A protein has these predicted regions:
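GIY-YIG nuclease catalytic motif and its immediate N-terminal context
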Residues: 1-40, 46-56, 67-70, 87-90, ...
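Residues at or immediately preceding the N-termini of alpha-helices
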Residues: 27-28, 61-63, 77
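Short arginine-rich
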Residues: 70-85
Length: 111
């Protein structure tokens, strides 16, 4: 039986001044989609250039992931930063560590 994972993730911009929380079943694909949309300018991540992964957690069920996303979205920045710091104390951008080359060169080959 195929076991899917569902991810809750938090992105930031280069200066770490904004936080974006999302949910997906394919973490790499979704972050690349945020990156591709950077020139559109209509989404939150495009407007604030939030493509850098600081935090993620996996869930077995989509309902749990969605509930967790909503929970985190309801938090103040300070509480989100506490969660991020527990997971990623150096506040490193995790894109390259998890996905290899970042930003992606050949986006079309990865989608």
């Amino acid at each position: 039986m195929l076991h899917r994972k569902f991810y809750v993730y938090i992105l930031t911009n280069q200066n770490k001044t904004v936080l974006y929380t999302g949910v997906t079943n394919d973490l790499e694909q979704r972050i690349i989609e945020h990156w591709i949309g950077r020139t559109a300018g209509t989404s939150f991540t495009a407007k604030y250039k939030a493509y850098y992964l600081l935090f993620y957690e996996a869930h077995k069920y989509i309902n749990d992931a969605i509930a967790r996303e909503k929970e985190i979205k309801g938090w103040r920045r300070e509480k989100k930063m506490t969660l991020i710091n527990q997971f990623n104390p150096e506040l490193n951008f995790l894109n390259k560590e998890l996905f290899g080359e970042w930003p992606p060169d050949e986006v079309t080959n990865r989608l």
